[in-house]
C-alpha cells in the first residue's frame, strides 16, 4: 500500500523594546527595537509499505523537507546587504522496518539526505520484550547527523553583537 505524509508548520519569534538596553550592548537604533523571525517548514513524505509474515512490515520512502528561515529586517554593513534568510529544500530517502517475534518487538529506521544542507543521516533502532500485557522492557539507540538549529546559523537584531550568519562555517552535528 502507498502512504503519504504532508506536514506544514510556521514558527514566529518577536523581541521588542521601547528603548535600547546597555546590558545587551550597542544598539543600531535608539528606540522601538524590534527583532522578528519566521520559520516555515514543510515535510512531504511519500512511500510504499509492504507487510509479509516472515519479513515484517517495511516502509520505503522519499522525503522533501522545505524550509524558509528569515528575518524581515534588512541590514547594510559597509554598504553590503547582510544575509537575512536560509531557504532550501533537502531531499532524502529512508526505510522503516518493524517485526514481532514471540514476545520481542524490533524496530529500525534509517534516512539519508542526498541533496541539501540542513539534514543528514539518521539511524534509530529499538528492541523491546513484553513481560506481560502491561509491562515491557525496551532499549534503543539513535545516531543523528544534522546542522544546528537555525538560530545558531543566522540571527539579526537591532543590537550590534546579535547579528550573525554561520551557515557556511558550521558542519553537521553528530548526536548519539
What are these regions (language model features)?
Residues 7-14, 65-70, 113-117, 144-148:
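Structural signature of outer-membrane beta-barrel domains
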Residues 14-21, 71-79, 119-125, 150-158:
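Outer-membrane beta-barrel translocator domains and adjoining extracellular loop/strand segments
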Residues 38-44, 87-93, 119-123, 171-175:
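Residues that define the transmembrane beta-barrel architecture of outer-membrane proteins
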Residues 53-55, 101-104, 132-134:
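Outer-membrane beta-barrel channels and translocator barrels
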Residues 103-116:
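Transmembrane beta-strand segments that form the barrel wall of outer-membrane beta-barrel proteins
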Residues 134-176:
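Outer-membrane beta-barrel translocator/channel fold
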Residues 2-6, 60-63, 108, 127, ...:
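Membrane-embedded beta-strand positions of outer-membrane beta-barrel proteins
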Amino acid at each position: 500500500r502507498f502512504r503519504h505524509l504532508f506536514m506544514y508548520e510556521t514558527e514566529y519569534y518577536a523581541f521588542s523594546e521601547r528603548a535600547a538596553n546597555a546590558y545587551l550592548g550597542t544598539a543600531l537604533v535608539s528606540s522601538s527595537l524590534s527583532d522578528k523571525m519566521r520559520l516555515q517548514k514543510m515535510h512531504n513524505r511519500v512511500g510504499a509499505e509492504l507487510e509479509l509474515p516472515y519479513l515484517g512490515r517495511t516502509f520505503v520512502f522519499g522525503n522533501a523537507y522545505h524550509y524558509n528561515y528569515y528575518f524581515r529586517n534588512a541590514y547594510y554593513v559597509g554598504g553590503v546587504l547582510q544575509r537575512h534568510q536560509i531557504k532550501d529544500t533537502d531531499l532524502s530517502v529512508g526505510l522503516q522496518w518493524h517485526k514481532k517475534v514471540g514476545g520481542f518487538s524490533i524496530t529500525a529506521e534509517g534516512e539519508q539526505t542526498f541533496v541539501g544542507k540542513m539534514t543528514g543521516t539518521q539511524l534509530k533502532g529499538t528492541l523491546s520484550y513484553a513481560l506481560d500485557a502491561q509491562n515491557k522492557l525496551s532499549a534503543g539507540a539513535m545516531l543523528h547527523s544534522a546542522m544546528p538549529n537555525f538560530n545558531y546559523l543566522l540571527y539579526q537584531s537591532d543590537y550590534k553583537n546579535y547579528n550573525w550568519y554561520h551557515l557556511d562555517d558550521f558542519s553537521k552535528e553528530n548526536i548519539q
